[in-house]
Amino acid sequence: MEHKPTHTSGQCPVMHGGATSSNSSNVAWWPKALNLDILHQHDRKSNPMGADFSYREELKKLDVEALKRDLKALMTDSQDWWPADWGHYGGLMIRMAWHSAGSYRVGDGRGGADTGNQRFAPLNSWPDNANLDKARRLLWPIKQKYGNKISWADLMILAGNMAYESMGLKTFGFAFGREDIWHPEKDIYWGAEQEWLAPSGAENSRYSGERDLENPLAAVMMGLIYVNPEGVDGNPDPLKTAKDMRVTFARMGMNDEETVALTAGGHTVGKAHGNGNAANLGADPESADLEEQGLGWNNHKSRGIGRDTVTSGIEGAWTTNPTQWDNGFFHLLFSYDWWLQKSPAGAWQWEPVNIKEEDKPVDVEDPTIRHNPIMTDADMALKLDPEYRKISERFHKDPAYFSETFARAWFKLTHRDMGPKARYFGPDVPVEELIWQDPVPTGRKDYDVDAVKAKIIASGLSTGELVSTAWDSARTFRNSDKRGGANGARIRLAPQKDWLGNEPEKLAKVLNVLEAIASEFNISVADTIVLAGNVGVEQAAKAAGIAITVPFAAGRGDATIEQTDVESFEVLEPIADGFRNWQKQHYAVNPEELLLDRAQLLGLSAPEMTVLIGGLRVIGTNHGDNKHGVFTDNVGALSNDFFVNLTDMRYTWKPTGRNSYDIVERNSGNVKWTATRVDLVFGSNSILRAYAEVYAQDDNKEKFVKDFVAAWTKVMNADRFDI
């Protein structure tokens, strides 16, 4: 008789209806479907703090000096489960803060330290973030003690600041104000690679041509924060690495001097860890077993802590005194020749030739033992690249200048994604105004808004001109790093005034009129532009038979060209704007995906995106006055015609070219309207069609106008952190 195997694991007696993994999700079945989830992140359902919670109010209760004292005490309070190198956690805390902030990229403003995203996948499990889970666990007692009064996002950066101060650096300052998220971000594109640390020639590489890095990425590999410390694709060559550094740090918003300062300053303290076999490390935090309790890279096969820790695979300290801020990095870099060696873990590293015994750092556990210092390929680039070397030599000769430059660069690195100073909080906020903060003067609030509106109405500008100019001014806002927006009226300055998407000739005409009105009333052009847009919306609603007042908050200021980093603002130029049915050229990415990206950066929900599209189409704001998607015979009236005609089965849709369609009457065969993919997606995508049907209903004409005004006001005020 054949013996059949017995299943020893019991089956669950309940057939679960909840999809608790992604294996059978809609995305798995239809991977090319438009992912609207990026518009519905970080809502109240995932936030445990409640609707009434205000982090800014909690910060007012924080004893900042007590917190700083506790953090400094933590630095030298070594724990047996993860001992501090030389009895000081400074290097570990700095690396945690560096890697939290260093994921920022200027291309789309995503990444960075502003949300505390290092706690979640993928960042919590990136190879480059190995063992930073230990740093956060060391911080937990302090977070637990101060509770709601300090976010994880703020605490991680403040810990890095305090680490530097505890080792002798005078930091430039610190601002509280970063608010935690509660689940992984869904909108950030980290790269197309399907494996960690995939080389540049691998499938789905982020590089093309002669090492052209895909936008908006900054890191050279999936799973790295910036460049490969062993060299390009793990092959040591400092001059090639220098090229990678220049691209990567520029995409983080840093120039050459800041790049050298940050690299050297980051390696002035602490050490790299590679004294062991990396194969002995366990899974990363997201993959680790339940009993690991969210910790990863645990070594259960050997000691794996202290001097036997493996993290990057590179092994050693950069300086003689790794717990002290000094000029030791440049002293060693320029005092010795360096040659390539392999670490105990098998990683490439540079070590000095014939180094003096007293220049060697001592062992992390036994001060009677000394080891060679090390340099990464990036460190050697600071010596061998001609431009980097000039800067390095100046820092070497002038330690005070190096310290000041690093402190400023560190502040920029850790605060770049926080946006304007209006979001800063705390006693250590620097008074100095920095150009990378995109400063905007405070504007007037005490003026007769109705009188200004009357002047705008009598100006002769069309509804479409008023609305499109205000939209173009506000649409640059990025909720990712809080840059852009209507405040400052930088649409009248270079480079924005010349952007193709802003229709420079028409813009100049409109600005000429609005600037005269602003001058007459002694108010900001920024306020006047937004108020003019509001007037246009009110007139369009009136033309549709609905009286409504668009909310307006005065107080915007006008930035000057001296307050504007022209090169920095170039990254805000739109390559497409589905809201105005325009794109600069055809791209590999579909127009509706570009629309979704802009909506997400503006902080819009899918219903808000939908209602804005429908309203802007019928008002007549299309770029170049193109007629695509203008499904109405009454242009200029804020009606729901776009949705009514989009969902009307009297019409059929026929492609006429790439991103071009005709709307044809079924009975006559006559072409009624034309459209783009951005228009059609609101009838094609099942979710967006559901929203479109709501606004097409006969009983929702007034709701449509009210919802449009609410979404419009949200965009106009997106950068008003002062209200």
UniProtKB/Swiss-Prot annotation:
Formation of the three residue Trp-Tyr-Met cross-link is important for the catalase, but not the peroxidase activity of the enzyme. Its cofactor is heme b. Binds 1 heme b (iron(II)-protoporphyrin IX) group per dimer. It is an enzyme of class 1 (oxidoreductase). Its EC number is 1.11.1.21. The active site is at residue 99. It holds the Pfam family peroxidase. The keyword Heme applies. Gene3D superfamilies: 1.10.520.10, Peroxidase, domain 2 (1.10.420.10). Keywords: Heme, Hydrogen peroxide, Iron, Metal-binding, Oxidoreductase, Peroxidase. Heme b binds at residue 267. There is a cross-link at residues 226-252 (Tryptophyl-tyrosyl-methioninium (Tyr-Met) (with W-98)). There is a cross-link at residues 98-226 (Tryptophyl-tyrosyl-methioninium (Trp-Tyr) (with M-252)). Transmembrane segments: none annotated. It catalyses: H2O2 + AH2 = A + 2 H2O; 2 H2O2 = O2 + 2 H2O. One of its GO terms (cellular component) is cytosol. CDD domains: catalase_peroxidase_1, catalase_peroxidase_2. PROSITE patterns: PEROXIDASE_2, PEROXIDASE_4. One of its GO terms (biological process) is hydrogen peroxide catabolic process. Bifunctional enzyme with both catalase and broad-spectrum peroxidase activity. Homodimer or homotetramer. This is Catalase-peroxidase.
